[in-house]
Regions:
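An N-terminal hydrophobic leader/cap segment in hydrolases
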Residues: 41-82, 87-108
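Membrane-embedded segments
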Residues: 84-181
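Hydrolase active-site cap/lid region
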Residues: 205-271, 327-330
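Short beta-strand/loop motif that positions the catalytic acidic residue
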Residues: 274-275, 281-283, 287
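C-terminal catalytic histidine-bearing segment of alpha/beta-hydrolase fold enzymes
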Residues: 292, 296-299, 304-347
Length: 347
């Protein structure tokens, strides 16, 4: 006997069958190959941007600093000075370019004696990252050599192959020691200093200490200078060109943690009030770390302290060239600017 099924039961069974039926899957939408590669490229760039500063910090000392000729510096010798007990600093001495043939194969004693040949001498004090092999530092040494000057580029304690830990008194001690070492061998030659970035703070610290000892540099060049270590970070974070860089996590570690962790102050602003040595300030208008307004303030302080328009000069470089913080050595006008400054020291 057949079971009778009424209409209401048929409707119920149909509804239950519909609920139990699997929902049809939507067709897979495949992303265009162009968009996939664009995403991969963008992610790769972000990773590189975040990690390159960190890698540079970690691997900045892998160069063989004992062989400056392999790094683009001919007629240059590498040597070491013991600035105090337990501290040995590495130094490169590049002689004037016109002596390059004579310098081939010579030892440290020959280079020391060469300091008394009457040519102007520059001590170069670099910034707070890397070592003396950085391209812009080699570039400055080559410019000075081409002008007929001696260039001595030192790695402070804790930098490059120098021993010890970097502290403000320690870096200043290293610079004072190098000055005294050069002065003993320089005869009547001019002895000037070129401080870049953090090196400007070491420069002014050293200049003040030398004044207390009755000594002084014959001329000072400050490039990309900070007013002081204690306000440098704030100045940089407020700079309109730096918004992009601070998106990457290692920038602060790479640039300012060395100053913060080692309590580096370097009161350039206060030091300038005491210095009476001729000063030339070099600054790029597009410096992405130190705004041009800092250079203008340094110029104002130094000019007021020395009460002279002739003994303090500010040389701005057009931002359209893209020199940023480290690239002034590429400007074709720089050698003549430096030459005129040195000539003014003996006028």
């Amino acid at each position: 006997m057949k079971r009778r099924v009424d209409k209401s039961e048929r409707k119920f069974q149909a509804a239950r069958h519909q609920q139990s039926s699997p929902t049809p899957r939507p067709k897979h939408v495949r992303a265009s190959p162009q968009w996939s590669w664009a995403k991969i490229g963008l992610i790769s760039l972000l990773i590189l941007g975040a990690t390159i500063p960190f890698l540079l910090h970690v691997f900045s000392d892998i160069d063989d600093l004992s062989r400056p000729s392999d790094l683009g510096l001919n007629h240059t010798i590498n040597f070491y000075l013991k600035t105090e007990e337990g501290v040995r600093v590495g130094v490169w001495h590049t002689v004037p370019e016109h002596r390059w043939k004579e310098a081939q194969g010579k030892n440290v004693e020959w280079y020391e004696k060469a300091l008394g040949d009457g040519s102007p001498i520059f001590i170069y004090l670099h910034g707070n990252t890397g070592n003396r092999s950085a391209p812009h530092r080699i570039g400055v040494a080559n410019i000075l050599s081409a002008l007929g000057y001696h260039a001595l580029v030192m790695d402070y304690r804790g930098f490059g192959d120098s021993t010890g830990e970097p502290t403000e008194p320690g870096l200043t001690t290293d610079a004072i020691y190098l000055y005294n070492w050069v002065k003993k061998r320089s005869g009547n030659s001019l002895v000037c200093v070129w401080g870049h970035s953090l090196g400007s703070g070491v420069t002014t610290n050293t200049a003040v200490k030398l004044l207390e000892q009755g000594e002084k540099f014959d001329g000072i060049i400050l490039e990309g200078a900070f007013l002081s270590g204690r306000v440098a970070a704030n100045q940089v974070f407020e700079h309109p060109f730096t918004w992009y860089y601070w998106k990457f996590p290692y920038i602060q570690f790479y640039l300012f943690n060395p100053m913060k962790n080692n309590n580096l102050d370097f009161p350039t602003d206060k030091n300038l009030e005491k210095i009476r040595t001729p000063i030339m300030i070099l600054h790029s208008e597009d410096d992405h770390l130190v705004p041009m307004s800092v250079a203008q303030e340094i110029y104002r302080i130094a000019k007021k302290a020395q009460n002279s328009d002739e003994r303090v000069k500010l040389v701005p470089f057009d931002g359209k060239h893209g020199y940023l913080h480290n690239g002034l050595y590429r400007d074709p006008a720089l050698p003549n600017i430096v030459r005129e400054f040195v000539q003014s020291l003996t006028a």
